[in-house]
Regions:
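Compositionally biased terminal segments of proteins
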Residues: 1-169
Length: 169
């Protein structure tokens, strides 16, 4: 999308492309760079009032879920799977699946193969294989992790339920 748009300009000459990150080139003899955005829509935020009376702007729970789910696809780390499972329980599996079923409206297809983020997410949530899988055995020793999430089977059951619901719509 971005690459095609800049290459349509007669004065543009592409030098290097790092997909999903940056396009470097020349625009009428001037070195230029364009950052490719992975988001297709702005963050959904809400204001929260702190006990002090100050207000902070934070992502909505649904947005937090989308961010963490995208990180599952992008980073494939245990901590992201844990966060998706925990947020799915807070929102409810049906609502979480509904939110994640629409993730393609928020994030661009990073693989550029037409499958979209949602398809890859269903695969990864349905069969979680984090790149840092050695961390899974350490979950019981995490001090501030809620007891239910120290059991990887609980995490995978929750993620599997979300994936199944996403797949069936």
């Amino acid at each position: 999308m971005v690459l095609e748009a800049v290459e349509e300009d007669d004065g543009w000459a592409t030098n290097r492309v790092a997909l999903g990150k940056v396009i470097l080139g020349n625009l009428d003899g001037v070195e230029a760079g364009v950052r490719q955005m992975i988001r297709k829509a702005p963050l959904e935020v809400t204001k929260v009032e702190l006990p002090s009376g100050a207000e902070v702007t934070v992502p909505t729970l649904e947005e937090m879920l989308r961010i963490k789910a995208f990180l599952v696809v992008r980073r494939n780390q245990t901590r992201d799977y844990l966060d998706v499972a925990a947020l799915a329980v807070v929102l409810g599996v049906d609502r979480a699946a509904e939110v994640l079923g629409q993730i393609n409206e928020y994030y661009a297809d990073q693989a550029h193969n037409g499958d979209g983020v949602a398809s890859q997410l269903v695969r990864q949530l349905g069969d979680p294989r984090p790149a840092d899988s050695q961390v899974i055995t350490q979950l019981p020793s995490y001090r501030r992790l809620r007891q239910e999430w120290k059991d990887w089977d609980t995490v995978t059951e929750t993620l599997g339920a979300v994936a199944a619901r996403m797949a069936t719509g």
